[in-house]
């Protein structure tokens, strides 16, 4: 009996705890529940394993635990609230983890937060701070925007109060006014992809707007961004 228990113990020790999922999706304060759900749907449809973390969990995570993941995704929402719900220690931990090799995908609010936001941002951009896309100045808060991608031509993608990403990284896609809509680059040893638009947007978000690009093509584009960030694969750029 003792020998049997020892064998079980040794077997469990050899197996160890399960490896973490490769992707950590932030679901905490300030994130849009609808955007979290849209990203979860794409991850699950494409069999990409992921874990989630809310603000409390991210505030308590250690750098060694965070660096066990390959990619951190911060979705859309309110970048002011995202920063406010995290401690300065937490954002410093995330920054160190990215610069140690964790990759980062920031979508809309997540892109603002990835820059040098004054609201406890991550500053993965060496001090570059992003402003809103110019449509905001015309009183427009959501729109179907034709985005010129360097590799795949023009796609109509959903935009809602998102940033233009001028001043950092290689430009993957542009807004109609020529400002960057998607950028990529290194932050230390981490690969960073920032998007001012929402290619993951479901059909329900399109009501009242006119798109030339079908939802399926938009969601495929979202998957492409996720895989590029996860696998550190540079996208075609200008």
What are these regions (language model features)?
Residues 115-153:
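Class I SAM-dependent methyltransferase SAM-binding "motif I" and its flanking Rossmann-like core
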Residues 81, 113-116, 121, 133, ...:
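Short catalytic/ligand-binding loop motif for oxyanion handling, primarily in non-cytosolic enzymes
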Residues 21-23, 37, 95, 121, ...:
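Extracellular ligand-binding/catalytic regions of CAZymes and related secreted enzymes
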Residues 1-7:
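Sec-dependent signal peptide recognition
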Residues 139-205, 238:
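Catalytic beta-strand/loop cores that center a nucleophilic Ser/Cys/Thr
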Residues 25, 32-118:
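Helical hinge/lid and interdomain linker segments adjacent to catalytic or ligand-binding clefts
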């Amino acid at each position: 009996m003792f020998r049997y228990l020892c064998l079980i113990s040794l077997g469990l020790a050899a197996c160890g705890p399960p490896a973490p999922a490769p992707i950590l999706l932030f679901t905490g304060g300030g994130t849009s529940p609808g955007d979290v759900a849209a990203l979860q749907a794409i991850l699950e449809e494409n069999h990409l394993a992921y874990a989630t973390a809310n603000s409390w969990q991210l505030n308590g995570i250690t750098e060694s635990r965070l660096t066990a993941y390959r990619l951190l995704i911060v979705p859309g929402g309110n970048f002011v609230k995202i920063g406010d719900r995290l401690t300065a220690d937490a954002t410093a931990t995330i920054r160190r983890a990215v610069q140690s090799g964790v990759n980062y995908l920031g979508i809309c609010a997540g892109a603002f937060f990835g820059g040098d936001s004054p609201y406890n941002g991550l500053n993965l951009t060496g001090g570059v701070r992003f402003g809103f896309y110019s449509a905001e100045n015309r009183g427009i808060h959501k729109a179907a925007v034709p985005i010129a991608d360097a590799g795949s031509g023009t796609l109509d993608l959903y935009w809602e109060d998102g940033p233009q990403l001028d001043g950092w990284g290689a430009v993957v896609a542009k807004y109609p006014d020529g400002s960057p809509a998607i950028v990529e680059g290194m932050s230390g040893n981490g690969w960073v992809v920032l998007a001012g638009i929402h290619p993951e947007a479901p059909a329900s978000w399109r009501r009242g707007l006119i798109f030339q690009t079908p939802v399926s093509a938009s969601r495929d584009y979202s998957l492409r961004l996720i895989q590029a960030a996860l696998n550190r694969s540079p996208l075609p750029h200008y």
